[in-house]
Amino acid sequence: MCGAPQTPDADRELVLTRLIDAPREKVFRCWTDPALLKQWFAPLPWTISHVEMDLRSGGTSLIVMKSPEGQEYPNPGVVLEVVKNEKVVFTDAYTKAWEPSAKPFMTAIMTFADEGGKTRYTARALHWTAADRKTHEDMGFHQGWGQCADQLAALAAKI
């Protein structure tokens, strides 16, 4: 059907949604302010040791996760789209300057919508293959991203 919205195959997509008791401007700010992102983006006891974000289409992103044992895991990517207070889209398919990554894994789409004075937060992870999706799910997508969403909600409520 012409004009119908296209959605990825369910076998390649993971979705998490939360109703956050905070205005979407605050939830969006928690996603786009590096100092705030560092406070919630890793499931505790993991932390974020470094954040670089150029929040424009084509801008580079680097988020470094740190394990409780001190091992660091850099996550480079490129920002694809930013709509203030509505959407953030990024991918690991590219690194800085549109250089293809060695192993593209996913594109992430975060949306923020008003819902009864709160924010409907939806995080979609779109994977290149069903195997990548399964790997991400087996790594603890629902638990890890769920814990991060809870940490995001707590931070957005207090800023």
Model-identified regions with their sequence ranges:
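Hydrophobic pocket/interface hotspot
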Residues: 27, 37, 61, 79, ...
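Hydrophobic ligand-binding cavity/cleft-lining segments
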Residues: 1-47
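Hydrophobic-ligand binding "helix-grip"
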Residues: 38, 42-43, 49-57, 62, ...
